[in-house]
Amino acid sequence: ASPAVVFTCATNKTEAACQTQAAIDASFAAWLLTTTATGGCNGSLTTSPTTPMAPNACGGSTTVTWTYTSSCAPLTTTCSATFTVTASPAVVFTCATNKTEAACQTQAAIDASFAAWLLTTTASGGCNGALTTSPTTPMAPDKCGGSTTVTWTYTSSCAPTTTTCSATFTVTASPAVVFTCATDKTEAACQTQAAIDASFATWLTTTTATGGCNGSLTT
């Protein structure tokens, strides 16, 4: 009697996403070899597809059917198994919203608000994700007014490979300076000193200034 056919089929296997493709390929190649067949007469073990390919490292599956043929019964023995790579985590991208701060705060306060605002853009998921900004080192606007637009880019080795967004941080313009200067004034002599003093005091107050930030009028 011909040797009995001994057919050992691979079992379904699952690998995690975000490994290198080389690691997935190596695991898949080793998995293929776990299907073995011996016995019968002139036995031949083939696969369908003829040249099985590993799934993508970002997720997918490959089902392989092995067929062992023998010129002695059983003439054909088959089995199938599936090698799966789990799907990569979905990219979750939360972008900062435009923000406006009032002028005339301290620069330290503006810088702190800007730094906190930068952190409101977050990204996770995909594979080997990296979040970068343009400009590389964003700087807060001047406390007296201005704006900074930042573009964030999240890259992943699995789709979506690039996700971007932009937002603007603005400091309102400081109020315009309005400066009204006293005009030359002449008083007649021979008034009382009290009258001159009163007129002088009134004249001093005709110079006024408003606007800017933390303005101070001195003489």
Question: Locations of the language-model features?
Answer:
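Proline-threonine-serine-rich low-complexity tracts
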Residues: 1-219
